[in-house]
């Protein structure tokens, strides 16, 4: 303080001497302002020196942590218990396990791994502690929602999830597109419900791409047309087709005529091995008086029976691919596959497979193609 007083006195003497020499007051003021930053710099340096001193910070931190004597060293060195319930002491900075947790072992760990964390301010340490506590709380909330005990988290987490997923997924229908080769059609065959038997895919007559109808009119056919029915069953390849008749879908025809529903969103272009599967997780939505004729129809004399056009499908599928919901009287979700080996022979050449009987129900869907321009007359059920 004495030095600062002397410096201020000397500055004043210099100003008064220059004023006696007859200089203007403005020049004297300028001369007086020039040496003033020196004592201000000295003051700022003296003000900056107290923060690096460890004594006031340690005293303040000790004073704040005195009420929490039980976990004071854990908060000071950022050590927390494992959120998995094992009781291990973990470092909140690096996550390493601290053997024989104590203040000395925690300090030695910090000095070896990350000594810079000893200089963290109390606010930074509080932020780390808060984030750690939030993470532990989130883990506890997740475990509280799961019925399994915390000791066997990894073992029993997979069991309640499959039980809950089917309940949540029963309402909507799913459309899955598989871009696999035709050498792997066994997955739909294995997932096929027990009551279904393999069917050959229907023969769809060739139609021009320009005959597509608007989306709203696709399901409302004029009275002079009969939609072609598509039999559902597992996808077929040349190796799995039991039907030896020549006009079957395994004929070496390179041309591809997709149904109108499929052409609606692909324009007839399919990659190699394209498979479209429609899964319906719902049970029958109602008594299904409109669907029971389709489910009760049987194939006789090698020709399947025709039926009247089906009513409009649910609006959900109409907005996606214009595919009708296929309902099966079974508890397991059915699967429908559409392969690229449709042929161009007319509908009348469709026959039941070699190993099929004529008394099991077939589940059919509708398309907007016609058969020789004349509708078939459906037989009563």
UniProtKB/Swiss-Prot annotation:
Sites of the Glycyl lysine isopeptide (Lys-Gly) (interchain with G-Cter in SUMO2) crosslink: 48, 189, 220, 290, 294, 374
Q: Does the keyword Nucleus apply?
A: yes
- UniProt-annotated stretches for the region Disordered: 42-73, 144-264, 283-320, 339-381
| UniProt biased composition (Basic and acidic residues) | 218-228, 287-299
Pull one GO CC term from this UniProt entry: site of DNA damage
Which key words tag this protein in UniProt? Chromosome, DNA damage, Isopeptide bond, Nucleus, Phosphoprotein, Repressor, Transcription, Transcription regulation, Ubl conjugation
Top-rank taxon of the source lineage equals Eukaryota
Primary site of residence: nucleus
Induction, per UniProt: In response to DNA damage; expression is regulated by KLF4.
**Which Pfam family is one of this chain's hits?**
zf-C2H2_12
Question: Please, one GO biological process term?
Answer: regulation of protein ADP-ribosylation
InterPro entries per the UniProt record, alphabetical: SPIN-DOC_Znf-C2H2 (IPR040647), ZnF_transloc-Spindlin_int (IPR052675)
**Any idea where this protein resides?**
Nucleus; Chromosome
- Residues bearing Phosphoserine? 121, 148, 248, 251, 308, 310
**Role according to the record:** Chromatin protein that stabilizes SPIN1 and enhances its association with histone H3 trimethylated at both 'Lys-4' and 'Lys-9' (H3K4me3K9me3). Positively regulates poly-ADP-ribosylation in response to DNA damage; acts by facilitating PARP1 ADP-ribosyltransferase activity.
Assembly, per entry: Interacts with SPIN1, SPIN2A, SPIN2B, SPIN3 and SPIN4. Interacts with TCF7L2 in a SPIN1-dependent manner. Interacts with PARP1; promoting PARP1 ADP-ribosyltransferase activity.
What is this protein identified as? Spindlin interactor and repressor of chromatin-binding protein
What is the protein's species of origin? Answer: Homo sapiens (Human)
């Amino acid at each position: 303080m004495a030095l600062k007083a002397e410096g201020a006195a000397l500055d004043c003497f210099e100003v008064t001497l220059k004023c006696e020499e007859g200089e203007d007051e403005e020049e004297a003021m300028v001369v007086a302002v020039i040496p003033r930053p020196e004592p201000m710099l000295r003051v700022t340096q003296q003000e900056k020196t107290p923060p690096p001193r460890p004594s006031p910070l340690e005293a303040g931190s000790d004073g704040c942590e005195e009420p929490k004597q039980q976990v004071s060293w854990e908060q000071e060195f950022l050590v927390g218990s494992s959120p998995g319930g094992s009781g291990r002491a973990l470092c909140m900075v690096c996550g390493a396990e601290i053997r024989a947790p104590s203040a000395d072992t925690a300090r030695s760990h910090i000095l070896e791994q990350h000594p810079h964390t000893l200089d963290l301010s109390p606010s930074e340490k509080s932020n780390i502690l808060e984030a750690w506590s939030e993470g532990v709380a989130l883990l506890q909330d997740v475990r509280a929602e799961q019925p399994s005990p915390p000791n066997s988290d990894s073992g029993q987490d997979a069991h309640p999830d499959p039980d809950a997923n089917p309940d949540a997924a029963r309402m909507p229908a799913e459309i899955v597109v598989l871009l696999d080769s035709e050498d792997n059609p066994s997955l739909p065959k294995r997932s096929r419900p027990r009551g279904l038997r393999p069917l050959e895919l229907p023969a769809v007559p060739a139609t021009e791409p320009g005959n597509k109808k608007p989306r709203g009119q696709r399901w409302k056919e004029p009275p002079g047309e009969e939609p072609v029915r598509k039999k559902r069953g597992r996808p077929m390849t040349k190796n799995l087709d039991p039907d030896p008749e020549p006009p079957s879908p395994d004929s070496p025809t390179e041309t591809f005529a997709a149904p109108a529903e499929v052409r609606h969103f692909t324009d007839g272009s399919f990659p190699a091995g394209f498979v479209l599967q429609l899964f319906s997780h719902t049970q029958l939505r109602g008594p299904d008086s409109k669907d029971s004729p389709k489910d009760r129809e049987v194939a006789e004399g090698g020709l399947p029976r025709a039926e009247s056009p089906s009513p409009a499908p649910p609006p959900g599928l109409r907005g996606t691919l214009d595919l009708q919901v296929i309902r099966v009287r079974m508890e397991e979700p059915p699967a429908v596959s559409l392969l690229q080996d449709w042929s161009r022979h007319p509908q009348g050449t469709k026959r039941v497979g070699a190993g099929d009987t004529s008394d099991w129900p077939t589940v059919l869907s509708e398309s907007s193609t016609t058969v020789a321009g004349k509708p078939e007359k459906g037989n009563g059920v």
